């Protein structure tokens, strides 16, 4: 309700919503949330892995292709399946218990299912896991092998998978930030009490 009130208090936002959805648009919280979601889905960072998926067989070098094979053969692709290399719901601790599971209050949904995180730009998003207890990508790969695959991945396999994961590093787009509308007399002010 508060979000709707703020957005509706700014004529520039109303104009933008009418431009996007038509002059009879009803600005609701759901529409605002959907609009933000649509915007977020445009924030992609294409990588050499995407180039490879789009048919450029030379986009991945030999070591990255070897890492892809290891990633698939080890079973990582069982959960990291879609173009974003994540996104499905799966159990955590399938074949073992995450060594830092008791740190933090994360439990998953009512069935213990967790959303598999994307691996895009994974080399740039440490620390890892729900509680940020693992800082090394190699250690995260090794831990996932144990708790999700029941596998003691060799140092060679871990290094190979890590090389492949570097192929997920996206090219950052040039971002031109929009000028946000100024608040008006009708815009609710923060409650500082």
Feature locations, PLM:
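C-terminal capping alpha-helices of c-type cytochrome domains
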Residues: 5-19, 23-47, 133-193
């Amino acid at each position: 309700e508060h979000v709707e009130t703020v957005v509706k208090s700014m004529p520039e936002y109303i104009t933008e919503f009418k431009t996007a959805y038509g002059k009879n648009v009803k600005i609701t919280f759901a529409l605002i949330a959907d609009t933000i979601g649509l915007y977020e889905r445009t924030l992609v960072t294409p990588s050499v892995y995407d180039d490879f998926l789009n048919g450029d067989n030379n986009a991945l070098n030999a070591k990255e292709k070897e890492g892809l094979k290891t990633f698939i053969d080890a079973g990582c692709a069982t959960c990291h399946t879609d173009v974003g290399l994540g996104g499905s719901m799966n159990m955590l601790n399938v074949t073992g218990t995450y060594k830092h599971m008791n740190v933090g209050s994360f439990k998953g949904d009512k069935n213990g299912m967790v959303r598999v995180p994307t691996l895009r730009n994974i080399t740039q998003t440490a620390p890892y896991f729900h509680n940020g207890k693992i800082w090394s990508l190699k250690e995260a790969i090794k831990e996932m092998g144990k708790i999700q695959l029941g596998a003691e991945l060799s140092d060679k396999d871990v290094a190979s998978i890590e090389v492949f994961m570097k192929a997920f590093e996206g090219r950052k787009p040039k971002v031109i930030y929009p000028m946000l509308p100024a608040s008006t007399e009708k815009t609710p002010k923060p409650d500082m009490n």
